[in-house]
Amino acid sequence: YEIYLKKQPIPTKLRGVELKWRRAGMKIALCGIGTVGGGVVKVLAENQAQFQAKYKEDLVISHVLTRDPDKVDRLGLESAVFTDRVEDIYEADIDLVVEVMGGVDFAYQVIRQSLSQGRHVVTANKDLLALHIDELQALANEKGVSLLYEASVAGGIPIINGVQVGLAANQISGVMGILNGTTNYMLSHMTQDGWTYDHALSVAQEKGYAEADPTNDVGGFDAARKITLLSRLAYDTRVDFHQVSVKGIDTVDASDIAIAAQAGYTMKLLGKSTKTAAGIQVGVEPVLLPNAHPLSGVSEA
């Protein structure tokens, strides 16, 4: 990522993110238990002692919302935590709701209801957030709880917390980054190995990087949702996902890559936004970068 800063006086009060822990331990409702949900269970189990030592509290999964009770058993959780009724989540004494179901409509209902009940929420649902982040964040602020979504952008890179907290004393004028691993994998091999677009997409699908319908990735829409969220945080203002200019790599072919390479350039799909006196411009498009540019060397997924 590249984030452009303007010098700004340090504010008298920085806004951080803090979860309020209850003495009896934090009760967690896990909504969804697929690959991501299973990973959450594993992380909590492996690091329970560390959490307890640091926060003097236990983290307890008290409810798991899923249609398949066998998934609960396979992860070694007690069968009593299973429920297929979202009403059980709403009616229980829960501190934190972790939404890892995916989709938009039902997940939105669960998150909105949880926040309205004064519960902290963690989600990685960028599709939902790109559409509803302003409403949900306002509700979280009103109820005095946290809405956390670090994993929605850039996976393990703590870019959201970096913007919210680490750069809170700065005025950001621009953001640019490679925001989609699938397309970066494809472009990397089209550049380095001479793969055609169709072959690169086929391999990406075989490896599980791209879905059977790859439109979300190759069309640039996944990156567009991410740059929408980052831009909203960077400029502390509403950014309409539907107003983002989006162009993917689905029209790029091997000859485009070869011509760029001969001229000393590397093609990357970038999410970019800038803030000027005229307003905020946000977009996603393939860009030719000089080979010496730091982002040119970012390869694979």
Regions found by a protein language model. Name each.
Residues Y1-G25:
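Short, Lys/Arg-enriched N-terminal segments with co-localized hydrophobic residues
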Residues V165-R225, L230:
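Conserved anion/nucleotide-ligand pocket segment
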